[in-house]
Amino acid sequence: MSIPDKIQTWQMVKGPTYDKEAGKVTAPGELQKTEIPVPELGAGEVLVEIAGCGVCHTDMSYFYDGVPTQTKPPLTLGHEISGTVVASGPGAESWIGKKVIVPAVMPCNTCGICDEGRNNRCLAQKMPGNSLGIYGGFSSHIPVPAQDLCVIEDLQGRPLANYAVIADAATTPYQAAIRAELKEGDPVLITGITGGVGVYMAQVAKAFGAKPIVGMARNEEKLKRALTMGADYVINTKDKDFKAIQEEFRAIAKQAGVKHNVGWKIFECTGVGAAQDIALGLLGFIGKLVVVGFGMQKNSYSISRLMAFDADIIGSWGCLPCYYPKVLEMVQSGKIDIDPLLETRPMSQIQQAFKEAHSGGLTKRIVLTPDF
């Protein structure tokens, strides 16, 4: 296997411009094609030749919204990565040649948080495109720790690049389902069911045996698709106030034969304030609200309602690497269908891909494939 002298990459050389007086971002970040040295690989580290990297909402937050990355620009974004191991440091030689999914969150596995089994929120975690130094997925290669890589033994005729979406879009909902203690027969509500994570949240919930699964979003065309991808019912929230949405939700619950205010597992997948407010407003007795999407806004909520309802609000960050093989199995067995929900484009189209992803008009997740 050929080992390059340089890594070809699309760096975010500058973050978005923030106007303090106006209190808002006035210009997006800047991307530049460049090359960076291949680092000397340490013990347990490998170099992965990237097959594909998904364009995620998190990347948009860094590039357009001013959410800070742990490593300051210049750095390369991108954390949904699949590829082939082409080189290794000491002790990781057996990984060479393996086709892998790179976890979006790679924990240290030695700290107190990791000892508690919450490795996905390790404070020393390495996340490509954020806290893995300058390295990210919109590149030809990436150096990563080997210990938590997910091996793909058989591609089953699917392009290796397509498996990139497992590294966040498909695994994040699985982690959220575990955090919610989701079980067969649980009623589920998903806000943002048409988004890059929401479409997989519905499929994961269905695989867990949840019923009914109700999805909310604002795009009618995408909502129709959601009915073929795990949802039993959908609600278009566009131009509706909370009371109208609540009445529609209650009618659906009645039709499905379940109580509208008892035991719902709610997955908020947008990170948008309006959707978060809906999710909070519909949280009822012994229910659980799992916060999956990230946003910078604040919400107003009477936390005494949690006491009165004996309800829970839970955060869910990324996914434990140990769950990746299970999600891979769900994809390969057909329980999670990824192929209709993605499209591959050459990485040279990254600037246009970012614009389209930021616009919110995409119907498929873009996976960029290196063409340096």
Predicted regions: what they are:
Residues 1-82, 140-144, 369-372:
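Short N-terminal strand-loop motif that marks the start
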Residues 180-181, 194, 208, 224-312, ...:
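Glycine-rich cofactor phosphate-binding loops and adjacent beta1-alpha1 units
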Residues 219, 295, 319:
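Residues in the short beta-alpha loop(s) of Rossmann-like NAD(P)-binding domains
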